[in-house]
């Protein structure tokens, strides 16, 4: 990750994204034990969970690296890395935190329902 073009000398690279996402998921489950689709909690722009999720990604788009220093945080979205349609109607698994990334609106719209093939 050292040579990743999204990491600059001006930004601190994140190393524990997976662990930080798990911690946030645990917090949500403790505070909202009946919630099954984590996406619905994180996606609310004015929520504390959304703010924490953005901080996990250093307020950077996971795809292009643009930050909220350059464009408004209103132009960022929580994206399903593997598109919802790939889950055949299983919103619970599609909305799990390990399938969510922070994306700028431009990248999210360009990605649409891109389907990743298995390697």
Feature roles, as predicted:
Residues 105:
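Conserved active-site neighborhood of enzyme catalytic/cofactor-binding cores
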Residues 66-102, 111-118:
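Histidine-centered nuclease catalytic patch
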Residues 108:
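Internal, well-ordered alpha/beta segment that forms a basic, Gly-enriched binding/recognition surface
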Residues 2-66, 87-94:
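Short, charged surface segments at domain edges that flank catalytic/cofactor-binding sites
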């Amino acid at each position: 990750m050292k040579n990743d073009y999204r990491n600059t000398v001006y930004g601190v690279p994140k190393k524990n994204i997976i662990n930080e996402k798990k911690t946030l998921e645990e917090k949500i489950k403790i505070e909202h034990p009946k919630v099954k689709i984590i996406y619905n909690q994180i996606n609310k722009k004015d929520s504390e969970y959304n703010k924490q999720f953005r901080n996990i990604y250093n307020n950077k788009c996971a795809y292009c690296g643009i930050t909220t220093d350059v464009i408004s945080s209103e132009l960022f979205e929580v994206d399903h890395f593997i598109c919802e349609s790939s889950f055949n109607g299983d919103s619970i698994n599609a909305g799990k935190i390990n399938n969510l990334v922070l994306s700028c609106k431009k990248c999210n719209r360009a990605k649409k329902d891109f389907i990743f093939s298995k390697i």
